[in-house]
Amino acid sequence: MSGRDNRGAGGGGGGHQPLSNAMGKLKEKLTRVGDELGYHRVESNLSTSNTATSLDTILPEDPFLFPQVSPQRHPQTVRTQRLLEDEPPLSFRPLLEDDDINEPPTQQQKRTPLRASGSLELTPLPPPPTSLEIREHRDRQQRGAQGDELQRSKQSLKGSRVSFERRDTGNSNTNSNKAAESSDEDSFEEKRTGFQQQKATSVDHKGILKDLKHILANDNRRQFQAKKHVSLDVKGTRFLQDLLKESSSEEEFHKTRREFQGRKHQSLDPRVTFKLDKVLQGSSTDSDEEGEDAEHKRLIHRPKDITKPVIIDLKDLESESDEDFLTSRQHFQQQRSISTDSRKSRRLYEMDEMGNKRGENIRHAVPFVRQITEDGKPKLEVYRPTTNPIFIWTQVIAALSVSLGSLVVGFVSAYTSPALVSMSDPNITSFTVTKDAGSWVGGIMPLAGLVGGVAGGPLIEYMGRRNTILATAVPFIVSSLLIACAVNVAMVLCGRFLAGFCVGIASLSLPVYLGETVQPEVRGTLGLLPTAFGNIGILVCFVAGSFMNWSMLAFLGAALPVPFLILMFLIPETPRWYVSRGREERARKALTWLRGKEADVEPELKGLMRSQADADRQATQNTMLELLKRNNLKPLSISLGLMFFQQFSGINAVIFYTVQIFKDAGSTIDGNVCTIIVGVVNFVATFIGILLIDRAGRKILLYASDIAMVLTLFVLGGFFYCKAHGPDVSHLGWLPLTCFVVYILGFSVGFGPIPWLMMGEILPAKIRGAAASVATSFNWTCTFVVTKTFQDLVGSLGAHGAFWLFGAICFVGLFFVILYVPETQGKTLEDIERKMMGRVRRMSSVANIKPLSFNM
């Protein structure tokens, strides 16, 4: 009795020591159990007067965080809770042992303090859920969150898919239904993996696509991102790869991933003007400034009507908050894929919503990519190659101006074919031209072209492309006047040497000028204008030579450079050369003239400046030693090999001595008429090459060209052999002309233009000037050897032996093309250089060809 009274009134007196000890032990046990189970610990003083409150405070209200249980009332930091499968149910009663209290309390004493304090009565808690229930609950939560994210991602993916004008509606509906049915995580991840692989396929620059697929299949996303960046990087920003690789944890990796994506886009975007990295940054603060509104509007649309570009506002592509990151990320990925795709539409496949390949290779697909909004209407069209509309007329004027120089080159090169006949006639010429002197009249021009090719490389670097071409006009006039007024063979040889020197310079500088001024979209067409005009010059020379003697023909040659000289004053220097000399403002004006006043030339100008900076860093003091490096020898040797087989096919011997060959053949057709026919075929074949060169491919045309030349040369050799040693072939007078026509046709579509085209495609940028000079000089050396020795070959081997020798060389050239020459059709210059020497080139290289007349 006394014990109960003392407990009720005392504040912790010594008379109630047993109960105090019991409560202390109870506190220790509760604290220890709470720590083991991960419960919150609340410090509270236990005493005999506040036993109920203390117990109610210490015990957790909800040990299991399930949705059906009310949330905790205490806002302390939540620690990770561990739910053990064998965890015993928590209850108050089992924690008190009988020996802890000397005087056991009654049932009323056990319940009264708690009720008096106003607290809830402690009852045994329900048993904890089993491990199966815990897993089911967690799966429901994850599926709920992932389902929302899945729907957002699918909607975003629908809004940023790639479409083409050729669309299979049936397959589209089927794939859309399949995508809608893929509502679980596994299906979405599987389709997303396919989308990533397909996207990597369209933009892979480094040929490591197999690694990408393998890594992605193994779910190593960090390594996949780093590897993919290496395959796409066109600016040497390898530090971005290290940004991912050096991440010490997944948290750090995800933390730096946005920065990586934004910076990677800047390193990959060839148009520079895109600000899509702001999509990943999740910030719109920069777009709020009025001063930058103009920067968000870029000319990135090019429909079929290129005269009506569309200006769009890139603010629509920016993310307003971090919550929009996942949604906007799909748009960013699609935009980046469009901006970095260098394989053009015929290399892409039509894709469904999830990026899976739908069917056939769309070889002739529309050359631009559309983003489709959710309502199916085009939101944005991006034409890959450039950001400016094609202002075609100024570029046509520039191409025509330099092509008139090619016409002069063609006329000068073909001059000896009709002129030597009248020059050797003593009734027309006041001086005697021996057979040996005649061979030098024909052979000294390519020898001088060799010297001009060597001098042309330094001249175009120091004087400029335009000024170098312009400087050849007056010497062309002087050389023709020297020949026209010649009173001896020496004056003719001097005139031919001066003309050949100018031809060597022009053969190098004309393609360089066009390659640096014409936009890629029209470079193939305008780049063949020099070839066409060169062949026109050959035709003009043949036609005029049929009724003019050698002196009058030379006067005509002196008049042809006059329009060429006038038009060259109207066109600007190449922006690339201005940038190399630090004249930024002049480069901007030149670009404005070439691209049009309405075009935004700043991105292209900045790209030229970056290319020049890269070229300056890679430049060495001794360029010739650079040519001997292993990586550079391979493309140089291929270019030299093509030049060798081009000239030793005998083309210049055929052109130089066409009239003489037909006279020796005893053809019933007049020799001058035959030369005109050959000139017409040569001219027509040029346009056939224009139609086929970007459709059939380089190697296919080389195969066809080589086979045609081999057959015709062997047949022509057989005809001359039968004429000299065999049966009468006078009734086959049409056969030489037929063989010549097929021979010229085959040469003009293959071995005529392609060696010069591939010289600009496969030679590395940093050695382009020196390597092109070497290749040009080698070409003229071969030309000189062939033209100078052709008459000697005919004298020693006979006409049949000379043609059979050329045919055998062409046959060997066929195997050279099969084994060593790469196919460059449809590939960017970066892809070609990576394949040839494992390096990516910055600047746009030359992709033009020397006219057939340059081969003389």
Swiss-Prot record:
Q: What does this protein do?
A: Low-capacity facilitative transporter for trehalose. Does not transport maltose, sucrose or lactose. Mediates the bidirectional transfer of trehalose. Responsible for the transport of trehalose synthesized in the fat body and the incorporation of trehalose into other tissues that require a carbon source, thereby regulating trehalose levels in the hemolymph.
Q: Which UniProt keywords apply?
A: Cell membrane, Glycoprotein, Membrane, Phosphoprotein, Sugar transport, Transmembrane, Transmembrane helix, Transport
Name of encoding gene = Tret1
In-chain residues carrying the UniProt-annotated modification Phosphoserine: 247-249, 319, 321, 844-845
The entry's cellular-component GO terms read:
plasma membrane
Molecular function (GO) terms for this protein are: D-glucose transmembrane transporter activity; trehalose transmembrane transporter activity
Q: Where is the composition biased (Polar residues)?
A: 69-80, 170-180, 329-340
- Supply the name of the protein: Facilitated trehalose transporter Tret1
State where the protein is found.
Cell membrane
Q: Known Gene3D superfamilies for this protein?
A: MFS general substrate transporter like domains
Compositionally biased region (Basic and acidic residues): 133-142
Q: Where is this region: Disordered?
A: 1-29, 62-202, 326-345
Q: Which organism is it from?
A: Drosophila yakuba (Fruit fly)
Q: Which PANTHER family match?
A: FACILITATED TREHALOSE TRANSPORTER TRET1-1-RELATED, PTHR48021
What CDD domains does the record point to? MFS_GLUT6_8_Class3_like
